[in-house]
Amino acid sequence: MTKTIAVIGVTGAQVRYLSALLTDKHTERSQGGSVANKFLSLGWNVRGITRSATSDSAKAQAAKGISIVEADLDSTSTLIPAFSGAHVIFAVTDFWQPFWESNARLSKISDRATGEHCYAIEVQRGKNIVDAIQRVLKEEGTLERFIFSTLPGFKEQSKGKYTYVYHFDSKAEITKYLKSKDELWSRSSLLNMTFYSSNIMRFWPLTKVSRLLFPLGFVVDRCCYSPRTVIDT
């Protein structure tokens, strides 16, 4: 029997939206898309979950053999049939699309307004995903693994020192909610992808020093080691 993986984030809308704003170009690279493409190459049935099956990116994924299913992360009832029958579910939630859609307006209110707004949206959508999967697991029992792309909570780990890192704290809050669902949590794995290497080429153009050397600067403590593994997405 060929197994099925359902992938949220298959069209990479969050990456394309930001890229379009800053460079007026779109990209087909995304975390969800890379997962879908990999499992497709392994012979799995891949179900791509997206808001619009008629978008150009959704059509491009469908042309590869990915089954595109429409669902709304703001509506648990639309997610349940999208997850039904899947053996594996991969989900990445989106902080940045609502951020760039609302920042020009909300940043005039306060320096926290946009972050708080997007935090609330992402957390609720993450909880909707968890609730829908929990429902499918209880009714069908066929789910083998749920993989959630998350991040550590800055506020918690800094003991309240850093409170502005909303895009980390939102995913950490979703993870906390997931852990409260005992049966689902026992079948869950967490993936921490703190930074996409593809963003380097998109937002920090590199200057070539030699044939193999492209310096890239990040501000870190001098005592801090910051190893980076390049993964093709």
Q: Each PLM stretch: what is its role?
A:
Residues 2-59, 74-76, 95-106, 113-119, ...:
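Oxidoreductase cofactor-interface core, primarily capturing Rossmann-like NAD(P)-dependent enzymes
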Residues 78, 121, 128-144:
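Fungal eukaryote-biased detector of long internal structured cores
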Residues 87, 134, 154-156:
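Alpha-helical repeat scaffolds in large eukaryotic proteins
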Residues 53-88:
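Conserved Rossmann-fold cofactor-binding substructure of NAD(P)-dependent oxidoreductases
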